[in-house]
Amino acid sequence: MGIKYSNKINKIRTFALSLVFIGLFIAYLGVFFRENIIIMTTFMMVGFLAVIASTVVYFWIGMLSTKTVQIICPSCDKPTKMLGRVDACMHCNQPLTMDRNLEGKEFDEKYNKKSYKS
């Protein structure tokens, strides 16, 4: 079994979703410290800030998603958004590139770094 590739936009959305659940869990932990109002409030505020951070990440990736190149995946024939020089299909995780110099090369995320010279 080969390496499982994942789309960058989906990775960031998954991170934002995990921030929501982590924030809710941290805020819920504050309930166990009802006797000490300072600790309870601290847990609730940190949890709230994590949920707000997830909102910011969702907003950021939404704005970034509007600027991406939309292409049709040659493997599954569904439209997908591509971020950077190399990315994976959102639906079938097929490695994709629009750079002719990278066609046929092994998929590697280092190709998206500015320091990489092809």
Swiss-Prot record:
Similarity remark: Belongs to the UPF0295 family.
Keyword Protein transport: no
InterPro entries, alphabetized: UPF0295
Entry's transmembrane regions: 12-32, 43-63
Pfam family, one: DUF2614
Organism the protein comes from: Bacillus cereus (strain ATCC 10987 / NRS 248)
Cellular component terms per the entry's GO annotation: plasma membrane
Protein name: UPF0295 protein BCE_0593
Topology of the protein relative to the lipid bilayer: Multi-pass membrane protein
Compartments reported by the entry: Cell membrane
Covalent S-S links between cysteines: none
Keyword Cell membrane: yes
